[in-house]
Amino acid sequence: LGPQLNKGCATCSIGAACLVDGPIPDEIAG
């Protein structure tokens, strides 16, 4: 999909997962 799903990668406790795996919602990645 797209980065619009990454609503809080920067604030996510494991936000790096958003960058590694791609467009993961912070609700899931965090």
From Swiss-Prot:
Temperature profile: Thermostable, retains activity after heating at 50 degrees Celsius for 24 hours. Activity decreases over 70 degrees Celsius.
Key words, A-Z: Antibiotic, Antimicrobial, Bacteriocin, Secreted
Pfam families: Subtilosin_A
pH dependence: Active from pH 3.0 and pH 9.0.
GO terms under biological process: defense response to bacterium; killing of cells of another organism
Stretches that traverse the bilayer: none
Location(s), subcellular: Secreted
GO cellular component: extracellular region
Family label: Belongs to the bacteriocin class V family.
Function: Bacteriocin that inhibits the growth of several Gram-positive bacteria, especially the food-borne pathogens L.monocytogenes, B.cereus strain ATCC 11778, B.cereus strain ATCC 21366, B.cereus strain ATCC 10876 and B.cereus strain ATCC 14579. Likely to act by disrupting the pathogen membrane resulting in leakage of intracellular constituents. Does not inhibit the growth of Gram-negative bacteria.
Name of the protein this chain belongs to: Mejucin
